Regions:
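Positively charged n-region of N-terminal signal peptides that target proteins for export
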Residues: 1-2
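A structural "domain/chain start" motif
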Residues: 5, 10-54, 153, 157-164
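Alpha-helical interaction segments
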Residues: 9, 95, 144-146
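C-terminal/domain-edge helix-coil "capping" segments
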Residues: 13-22, 105-164
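Amphipathic alpha-helical segments that form well-ordered structural scaffolds
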Residues: 51, 55-58, 147
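Surface-exposed short loop/turn segments
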Residues: 59, 67-138
Length: 164
């Protein structure tokens, strides 16, 4: 009985860290991709992309074309003009190259650089919500702003000297 209590307490202490903690360390440049599904509004998409660029650039993170790591913002909208509520999903993910542990140790042993890189998710956060059709764009924009703020906050936690 005592062993179970000790094991539970020990596992809770060790599992409190966020899985993406320190994954944004030394991140200085990214590419940006915006995917909108459910609404075809090129002007709004362009406005969102410009907003995202400005939010990232104001923190001195350089945006390059066709670069890895890639910051992907996925927006899925179900706009119901018939029903009172519409639904949306906004996801922000950072993808970069990685290598499996087995291949890493093999490349060290062989002193060769491996070419078997994988694309992995290094950071991810998302929001699901509901809104009226009249407030849908505004609520999606608020959600995007909240996710970008979370990303920037984590970036500063992983790169504390960038604040100065």
């Amino acid at each position: 009985y005592f062993f179970l209590i000790f094991l539970t307490a020990f596992s809770e202490i060790n599992s409190k860290d966020i899985w993406y903690e320190k994954n944004l360390k030394d991140l200085e440049d990214i590419s940006l991709e915006l995917n909108v599904v459910g609404i075809k509004d090129d002007v709004w998409e362009s406005r969102l992309y410009n907003f995202l660029e400005l939010r990232i650039l104001e923190h001195d993170i350089v945006i390059l074309k066709n670069q890895i790591p890639k910051l992907v913002i996925d927006i899925n909208i179900i706009d119901s003009r018939v029903e009172k509520t519409s639904s949306f999903f906004v996801g922000l993910s950072l993808y970069s190259y990685s290598i499996s542990e087995k291949m890493y140790y093999k490349s060290i042993a062989d002193t060769l650089i491996t070419k078997k890189l994988m694309t992995s998710k290094f950071f991810s956060t998302e929001i699901m919500g509901q809104s009226s059709s009249n407030n849908l764009y505004r609520d999606v924009e608020k959600s995007i702003n909240r996710l970008v703020s979370n990303f920037i906050d984590q970036w500063y936690q992983d790169n504390p000297l960038k604040q100065f």
